[in-house]
């Protein structure tokens, strides 16, 4: 993990290895040498991981001066926040760019501002948008807003780098459910005036099943009469 609390797993593994060496050999000289080597590995792990992550984006993705500020392996994907001169913050999911901070205003406009201003929905549902960038705009124009996002790591990255936590905490008409959007639609009987879908492009199997006729039929079934689906 980069950009957060240190990953202690390597240190624990190193301690366990040193203990095994001592138990098997019973020689403090060997144990001391192994302990010193383990300390060096643990100390170098962070800088080497940072350099490697930066190199991937600078050379493979050809982003000059790229720096990985946040890298977490969630149960669903690798979540990374990358910063580059002249480009600001970018969100990558499994190495694929999901969001560029420069595009946030346009994204907020056509996905949230336009439909919500036209409708002023009493009940609005936001599927995805783990960075929560659409939440303040939608909440201000809706009676109540529910966000359904499956990956907590994306939410954490969003609050830390894209959408300040303080304004979100002040919202009294917004709630967040950590769940799969399709499963939520299938299990819930709630209906909404506006459903906004902000999901990654179907470039991997994990996202492809959210871009199907079945998924959009579920969305339609959860709309109130005259309701709108924004994609």
Residue ranges and their predicted role:
Residues 1-231:
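Alpha-helical transmembrane segments of multi-pass membrane proteins
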């Amino acid at each position: 993990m980069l950009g957060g609390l240190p990953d202690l797993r390597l240190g624990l593994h190193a301690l366990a290895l040193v203990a095994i060496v001592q138990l098997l050999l019973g020689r403090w000289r060997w144990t001391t040498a192994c302990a010193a080597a383990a300390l060096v590995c643990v100390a170098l792990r962070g800088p080497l991981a940072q350099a490697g992550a930066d190199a991937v984006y600078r050379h493979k993705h050809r982003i000059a001066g790229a720096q990985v500020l946040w890298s977490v392996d969630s149960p669903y994907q690798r979540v990374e926040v990358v910063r580059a001169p002249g480009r600001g913050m970018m969100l990558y999911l499994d190495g694929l760019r999901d969001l560029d901070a420069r595009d946030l205003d346009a994204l907020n406009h056509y996905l949230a501002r336009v439909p919500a201003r036209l409708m002023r929905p009493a009940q609005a549902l936001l599927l995805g948008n783990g960075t929560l960038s659409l939440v303040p705009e939608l909440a201000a124009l809706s009676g109540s807003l529910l966000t359904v996002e499956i990956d907590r790591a994306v939410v954490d990255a969003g609050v830390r780098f894209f959408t300040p936590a303080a304004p979100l905490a002040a919202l009294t008409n917004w709630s967040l459910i950590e769940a799969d959007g399709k499963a939520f639609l299938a299990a819930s009987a709630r209906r909404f005036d506006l459903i906004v879908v902000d999901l990654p492009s179907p470039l991997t199997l994990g996202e492809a099943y959210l871009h199907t006729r079945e998924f959009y039929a579920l969305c339609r079934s959860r709309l109130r009469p005259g309701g709108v689906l924004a994609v």
